[in-house]
From Swiss-Prot:
GO terms for molecular function: tRNA (guanine(46)-N7)-methyltransferase activity. Its EC number is 2.1.1.33. It catalyses: guanosine(46) in tRNA + S-adenosyl-L-methionine = N(7)-methylguanosine(46) in tRNA + S-adenosyl-L-homocysteine. This is tRNA (guanine-N(7)-)-methyltransferase. The gene is trmB. The active site is at D150. It comes from Xylella fastidiosa (strain 9a5c). It comes from the Bacteria. It is an enzyme of class 2 (transferase). Substrate binds at K154, D186, T223, R224, F225, E226. Pfam families: Methyltransf_4. S-adenosyl-L-methionine binds at E75, E100, D127, D150. SUPFAM superfamilies: S-adenosyl-L-methionine-dependent methyltransferases. GO terms for cellular component: tRNA methyltransferase complex. Pathway: tRNA modification; N(7)-methylguanine-tRNA biosynthesis.
Length: 244
């Protein structure tokens, strides 16, 4: 059951959206279609009611959504879900929220979560900016993870990169004081842009010092994107910022 709060604190229980309705509702980006297998389609049909959160545009009480009070971790753009699934398996004391627009990746993770018997993961198939702006209360998150966002490697496309000043300010708003922001990239110039943006964002302090990086933490499993980058000779930058 979804748990929403209206402006006057009244609980609102909307009807679930179908997969086609979720696709039509997204307006701020073009969904990557990819190859949507029958198994992934069945995952939406069978497991979305258990793990899925339909975008409504109203603030949510996350403790009610998960049925408990626990630290909340958000992963933006979880891809095929490998990192999020790994974290949920190995850090069960956390509640996890994942956001992804790539339907096959969502379907794959739904199948994995059902196989694992996970109870503390909720997924959005929607635009992260919209979810953060309209459904996540300020200061509600203990950690935000963004692993290997699209580098938009051509210079003329850099403006499309996710990590921009306005988005960084939004992330700061949603993190509680004492929380952290963890990002990883295998593109050197994107790491430079992340440092440029985040070091200039009030409320964030690089745990490794100015333009510093940390070793890959235990909670981040190596993804196929990371392995692909390493095969191309790319190194990986893990950046960890504390919310102050």
């Amino acid at each position: 059951m979804m748990n929403l709060l209206s402006n006057d604190g009244v609980q609102v229980l909307p009807r679930p959206f179908t997969l086609n309705e979720r696709r039509r509702e997204v307006r701020s980006f073009v969904l990557r279609q990819g190859h949507f297998t029958p198994a992934q389609k069945r995952a939406f049909d069978h497991y979305w009611p258990r793990f899925g959160v339909d975008f409504i545009g109203q603030l949510r009480d996350l403790d009610v959504l998960f049925g408990r009070s626990a630290p909340k971790v958000l992963e933006v753009g979880f891809g095929n879900g490998a990192a999020l699934r790994f974290a949920a398996q190995h850090e069960p004391r956390y509640d996890y929220i994942g956001i992804e627009v790539y339907a096959p990746g969502v379907g794959r993770l739904l199948n994995g979560l059902a196989e694992d018997g996970s109870r503390h993961v909720r997924l959005y198939h929607y635009d992260a900016v919209e979810v953060l702006n309209k459904e996540i209360v300020d200061g509600a998150l203990d950690e935000i993870r963004i692993y290997f966002p699209d580098p938009w490697h051509k210079k003329r496309h850099h403006k499309r990169r996710l990590i921009q000043p306005l988005f960084a300010t939004l992330l700061v708003r949603k993190l509680r004081v004492g929380g952290c922001l963890h990002m990883a990239t295998d593109w050197a110039d994107y790491a430079e842009q992340m440092w440029d943006v985040l070091d200039a964002t009030p409320g964030l302090v690089n745990r490794a010092g100015l333009r510093g990086q940390v070793p890959c933490p235990d909670w981040r499993v190596q993804t196929r994107f990371e392995r692909r980058g390493q095969n191309l000779g790319h190194r990986v930058w893990d950046l960890l910022y504390d919310r102050v």
